[in-house]
Amino acid sequence: MRHVLIAVILFFLSIGLSAGCAEAGNKTQNQSATEVNASPLQPAEYFIYHNLMNDKGLIKTDFSDQPSYLSESLGLWMEFLLSKNDAPHFQDQYQHLTDSFLMSNHLVTWKIQNGQASGTNALIDDMRIMLSLDQAAAKWGRSDYAQTARDIGTSLKTYNMNNGFFTDFYDSQAASKDVTLSYVMPDALAVLKKNGIIDEETEQRNANVLYSAPLKNGFLPKTYSSETKEYTYDSEINLIDQLYAAWHLPEGDEKASVLADWIKQEFQKNGKLYGRYSAYTKEPAVQYESPSVYALAVLFLTKQHENSSVIKAIYDRMNDFEIHDPVKSYYGGYMSGTQTHSFDNLLPLLAERKLFNENIIQ
């Protein structure tokens, strides 16, 4: 019922979106108001268009007077638009990628601030963007997307590897030495192999950083060293890191099952998930919650085909952080007081779209 009501509300709220999107797209939007309104916006989607997008169509990280624009936001937004089958807005973001984020070496700058692009990338964002471009090329028959995906992939192999492993970043001088496990994206590695950029051995070597990682007291390692070939475990785990890595595990994976069981037990016991836990006692180390934690839990458990009632309960808790009153200025936003972060809106948006696409929610 909630989603039917929201769809009705957004039909009227989105009447003004065509003007907002035209401004947000810096006059590059070609959709008519009818086309824009044909698919009702999710509340968080409405919030992003009206509160986080600047007049050029770039997503701000927060409400700072000197906003930054992250490749993380770009990649998550592109992934969402792809999942929604929104080709026109995906094209707009592709234009921002090539105009603003893609560096001369064909890696993606991780941050733009005060008009200056950092010379450093972030592996997970490059991988996500490359994967989205490859999938969009197949979906919409766009050879330019496919070529840009190949260009990014080739540069990742050239610059972002150490001792045969893709590592966290390249800072214009050298690749880093460590691999954060949540940065390992097997689907993106498969694209690199498909495009002839890496061979099967390299694909498997890098995927095995995640697949072969041993659990310690039920938790995944934080990093893997490309130098020592050893894993490092945190004494206090960040649940976002754990869930991101777990989301990338194969369906039915044994480690994924262990983590899924703990997530379900923790949520059923406390009715919530906290941001950080002791790796030894498994007790909460903080008292804060995060919409992103719930979003990743939804994405992870959905991929593992867990019980839909548990997934919906976690989704409902995530939605407790969203502003539902359409007369509020920040309607649709996942807010902490008067503050927000793009990450905490984009991941819930992506998780909600996944549940729509899987018919878990209506």
From Swiss-Prot:
<feature type="signal peptide">
    <location>
        <begin position="1"/>
        <end position="20"/>
    </location>
</feature>
<keyword id="KW-1003">Cell membrane</keyword>
<protein>
    <recommendedName>
        <fullName>Putative lipoprotein YdaJ</fullName>
    </recommendedName>
</protein>
<dbReference type="InterPro" id="IPR012341">
    <property type="entry name" value="6hp_glycosidase-like_sf"/>
</dbReference>
<keyword id="KW-0449">Lipoprotein</keyword>
<keyword id="KW-0564">Palmitate</keyword>
<dbReference type="GO" id="GO:0005886">
    <property type="term" value="C:plasma membrane"/>
</dbReference>
<feature type="lipid moiety-binding region" description="S-diacylglycerol cysteine">
    <location>
        <position position="21"/>
    </location>
</feature>
<dbReference type="GO" id="GO:0005975">
    <property type="term" value="P:carbohydrate metabolic process"/>
</dbReference>
<dbReference type="InterPro" id="IPR008928">
    <property type="entry name" value="6-hairpin_glycosidase_sf"/>
</dbReference>
<keyword id="KW-0472">Membrane</keyword>
<feature type="lipid moiety-binding region" description="N-palmitoyl cysteine">
    <location>
        <position position="21"/>
    </location>
</feature>
<keyword id="KW-0732">Signal</keyword>
